[in-house]
Regions:
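Generic helix N-cap/helix-start motif at coil->alpha-helix transitions
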Residues: 4-13, 24-27, 39-49, 55, ...
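Structural motif corresponding to the intra-repeat A-B loop/turn of tetratricopeptide repeats
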Residues: 20-21, 55, 100, 134
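C-terminal non-catalytic interaction modules
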Residues: 145-171
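Extended alpha-helical scaffolding segments
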Residues: 120-122, 126-132, 137
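Alpha-helical repeat scaffolds
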Residues: 1-2, 24-38, 62-81, 103-114, ...
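Generic L/I/V-rich hydrophobic alpha-helical segments across diverse proteins
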Residues: 76, 90, 109, 125, ...
Length: 171
């Protein structure tokens, strides 16, 4: 909308974005206060993580602020993971860590996923994405081979997510 030549369209689009941004800032202040008052409440922690995931996905923040909140999100997810090992938390961590390019921590999360959900498609999707992102061709090829040999079930979503690599490994 910012690139639109119609001044009125641009004005309404910017006004809407500013309002939405204000709303997120207000909600952020509320949840931060709630968390500060009760940092050990798992419900508040989950609410804070869910909010940050939503807020970060909107793309409203400047790069520096986004980095600060991504770091905060990682720390909160790790705290959740300390309370309870959970696949959803691991997936959220992998999503965030890959954006941050924190491969050291991503590898640790992959190990947790491997120990707990080795036959699950989420583990394999993230392992292959991780190896591809790191340009670890040999390990990627080995993982694709293991995926086939171990007869890991992939849903249509999993096949779509790994389609590029699966198609390439058939040749």
């Amino acid at each position: 909308a910012r690139m639109n030549e119609d001044v009125e369209v641009v004005h309404y689009a910017i006004t809407a974005m500013v309002e939405l941004s204000k709303e997120y800032d207000y909600r952020l202040q509320k949840i931060e206060k709630k968390y500060t008052n009760d940092p050990d409440d798992p419900v508040v922690l989950e609410e804070y993580c869910d909010f940050l995931k939503e807020y970060l996905s909107q793309g409203f923040m400047e790069k520096q602020m986004e980095q600060i909140y991504r770091n905060q999100y990682t720390q909160l997810l790790l705290k959740q993971l300390d309370q309870k090992v959970n696949l959803h938390i691991c997936v959220c961590l992998m999503e965030n860590l890959m954006v941050q390019r924190d491969f050291f921590l991503a590898e640790k999360i992959l190990k947790i996923m491997d120990q707990n959900w080795h036959r699950g498609e989420e583990y394999w999707i993230w392992k292959i994405r991780y190896l591809a992102e790191r340009k670890m061709g040999k390990e990627l090829k080995q993982s694709l081979q293991a995926l086939k040999e171990e007869h890991i079930y992939l849903s249509s979503r999993g096949k779509e997510a790994l389609g590029f690599w699966l198609d390439g490994s058939k040749k």
